[in-house]
Curated annotation (Swiss-Prot):
A zinc finger (C4-type) spans 57-72. This is Recombination protein RecR. It comes from Vibrio vulnificus (strain YJ016). One of its GO terms (molecular function) is zinc ion binding. Belongs to the RecR family. Residues 81-176 form the Toprim domain. GO terms for biological process: DNA recombination; DNA repair. PROSITE patterns: RECR, TOPRIM. May play a role in DNA repair. It seems to be involved in an RecBC-independent recombinational process of DNA repair. It may act with RecF and RecO. Pfam families: RecR_C, RecR_HhH, RecR_ZnF, Toprim_4. The gene is recR.
């Protein structure tokens, strides 16, 4: 079936979203045009507004429409000197949802990947270096993903911390709560055994 040029453009634009292939994009486009034109206009307006107004926090690099985000602006978040380093703004949302962290964040917007040409300055490690030099950070909690690249990035940042005499710690990785040992992969189980803690 031949479709209009504008419809093709809409479907192609929808495909920029993660996990959206040609069929999903077609379904979304048809739904908006057939059943929810008002919703489509609201979506277009919200997207346009967000793309022009949302930038990065000057302190932690997360998404915000202000120069400094609400977390970095909160004096109580500065008192304990904790800085949690994450790979993406979505990771901040995940950590915040636990209610267990009361410090500040630094968002890398990725991880080191020499094969892809992504070096330290590409993920803001020069900015992190400057923040460590300021002297208001006592401990850096490395919450990068447990991948080869995430581990390499954590190691690099730990070295930076050592240079500035700032404590560095790594979030624990291991068996999920409610998980069964026989279903856990070997690498995760190894991390669990190595990261065990005493009960008495």
């Amino acid at each position: 079936m031949r479709t209009s040029h504008m419809l093709e453009q809409l479907m192609e634009a929808l495909r920029c979203l993660p996990g959206v292939g040609p069929k999903s994009a077609q379904r979304m486009a048809f739904h908006l045009l057939q059943r929810d034109r008002k919703g489509g206009l609201q979506l277009a307006d919200a997207l346009s507004h967000a793309m022009t107004e949302i930038g990065h926090c000057n302190e932690c690099r997360t998404f915000t429409e202000e120069d400094v985000c609400h977390i970095c602006n909160n004096p109580k978040r500065q008192e304990n000197g904790l800085l949690c380093v994450v790979e993406s703004p979505a990771d901040i949302a995940a950590v915040e949802a636990t209610g267990q962290f009361s410090g500040r964040y630094f968002v890398l917007m990725g991880h080191l990947s020499p094969l892809d040409g992504i070096g330290p300055s590409d993920i803001g490690l020069d900015v992190l270096d400057y923040r460590l030099r300021r002297g208001d950070i006592k401990e850096v909690i490395l919450a990068t993903n447990p991948t080869v690249e995430g581990e390499a990035t954590a190691h690099y940042i730990a070295e930076l911390c050592r240079e500035h005499k700032v404590d560095a710690s790594r979030i624990a990785h291991g068996v999920p709560v409610g998980g069964e040992l026989e279903l856990v992969d070997g690498t995760t189980l190894s991390h669990s055994l190595l990261g065990r803690h005493k009960l008495n």
